[in-house]
Amino acid sequence: MQIKIEGIHDDRLHRPLQNIANLFYEECELAYGGEEPADFVISLALSQTDEHVTVSGEVKGTGIKEQHTKFFSPDMTEKEAFKQVKNTISYVYLNLLQAHTGITQKWGILTGIRPTKLLHKKLQSGMSKEQAHAELKKDYLIHDEKIMLMQEIVDRQLAAVPDLYRVKDEVSIYIGIPFCPTKCAYCTFPAYAIQGQAGRVGSFLWGLHYEMQKIGEWLKEHDVKVTTIYFGGGTPTSITAEEMDLLYEEMVRSFPDVKNIREITVEAGRPDTITEEKLAVLNKYDIDRISINPQSYENETLKAIGRHHTVEETIEKYHLSRQHGMNNINMDLIIGLPGEGVKEFRHSLSETEKLMPESLTVHTLSFKRASEMTRNKHKYKVAGREEVSQMMEDAVAWTKEHGYVPYYLYRQKNILGNLENVGYSLPGQESIYNIMIMEEVQTIIGIGCGAASKFIDRDTGKITHFANPKDPKSYNERFEHYTDEKIKYLEQIFEKTTKQH
């Protein structure tokens, strides 16, 4: 699909227009000039004064037209004024595409990853729920159903973490272990098949211990508390029980006041990595929150996406984990996996019912740019928009019926049906780390391979991103440098605290 756009001369608007086009068409190119033929042409005209911006638009040759005006407030910065212009253009453009295609976008012009962050911001500024909801509807064209979902999640987050707006003086820590038994077809996380990598794993773990020691030392010196620790990857349980033991021992030795950290989670996503020895190690350090991710309860699907475990193994390892004291288990399901439709997804839900994990994350398949699945899209047959929407409706109904509540939400580019990923839990079993990472309310220090840090200014909320290299070889060569860089950022963020000591 090729759409020609007339009347837009600011390159900064190209990406938002492309993101909205992607909501309607899987393969879509936008052209801003030239004589190449296009499937259709959208003409946009912008009229701007000091007080307001008006955008008019039409799908040429169809009679479909739209116009919208937004006013600038007197105290707006240049950046805020540009955002107002961008949103006005997006408003008109979305309505033109909805009328032209007959497809309704329930998230309106929102294409960002964190919709609930927008609602948190409005409520924090002193707006009532009613005012905030009215603005989301009027300015962003978000439908009531999605606004209600956002509000339910915000309420649940504030119940789970009553001091959510005050945790900026603490940090959370993400520890990335980049190894897996095999790499899944949809995955773009740092994940390297662990077989035959013994030397590289050993070098990586040496660097990881170093990072933990230095970061922990700094946190202790400056009296900065840790809210949560999350071991992700990869699959952190891919390493041996002995390596896990040494790693958690380092965690207890290096980080401040570990026994009072609110939550420690270890992803054990691949059931084929879970053993009695590894569960005993988790027990030793009082870690009882893990993830075991079936993704699907169809063996054919697991084979197709490169997961070398069976449905039976998932169930067996779930029960083994329960027997060894794992009291807070999360499981993931993915809507829209290759070859799966409503029937297969309902089967996965009925299998989940037999286990009743404390939390269930329902992902919608996303075609991530660097994944094997995206590179070879022709090999993977996936469900259409309507069927994917039906599966999401089934997930919403099933979770409600079984006492689960939504507590976090995020969206991705190129996600099937422009839907969302929702984390559900039984009340009181929410993952605090997931809330922290989604709502961006505190600094998160990323340690290990591919680990992304977010340094959040405690006064302005400005976010500075910093990432460790994704591949173990690069990490092993320069982990000292990356540790030093993170400590510099921490010193900037906690400058006032630093000066007091």
UniProtKB/Swiss-Prot annotation:
EC class (word): oxidoreductase
Listed cofactors: [4Fe-4S] cluster
Record-linked InterPro entries: Coproporphyrinogen-III_oxidase (IPR034505), Elp3/MiaA/NifB-like_rSAM (IPR006638), HemZ (IPR023995), rSAM (IPR007197), rSAM_horseshoe (IPR023404)
Chain positions recorded as S-adenosyl-L-methionine 2 binding sites: 186, 234-235, 295, 307, 332
Cited Gene3D superfamilies: tm_1862 like domain (3.80.30.20)
EC number assigned by the record: 1.3.99.-
Radical SAM core domain segment(s): 163-405
Cofactor comment: Binds 1 [4Fe-4S] cluster. The cluster is coordinated with 3 cysteines and an exchangeable S-adenosyl-L-methionine.
Induction: Induced under anaerobic conditions and by hydrogen peroxide stress. It is also dependent on induction by ResDE, Fnr and ArfM.
Residues involved in [4Fe-4S] cluster binding: 180, 184, 187
List of residues binding S-adenosyl-L-methionine 1: 174, 233, 267
Keywords noted in UniProt: 4Fe-4S, Iron, Iron-sulfur, Metal-binding, Oxidoreductase, Porphyrin biosynthesis, S-adenosyl-L-methionine
Entry keyword Metal-binding: yes
Gene Ontology BP annotations: porphyrin-containing compound biosynthetic process; protoporphyrinogen IX biosynthetic process
Effects seen without this gene: Cells lacking this gene accumulate coproporphyrin-III only under anaerobic conditions, however no obvious respiratory growth phenotype is observed under anaerobic conditions. The hemN hemZ double mutant do not abolish aerobic and anaerobic respiratory growth, however a reduction of growth is observed.
Note in the entry: HemZ is able to complement a S.typhimurium hemF hemN double mutant under aerobic and anaerobic conditions, however under anaerobic growth conditions, the double mutant complemented with hemZ grows significantly faster.
Name recorded for this polypeptide: Oxygen-independent coproporphyrinogen-III oxidase-like protein HemZ
Species, as recorded: Bacillus subtilis (strain 168)
Gene, per the UniProt record: hemZ
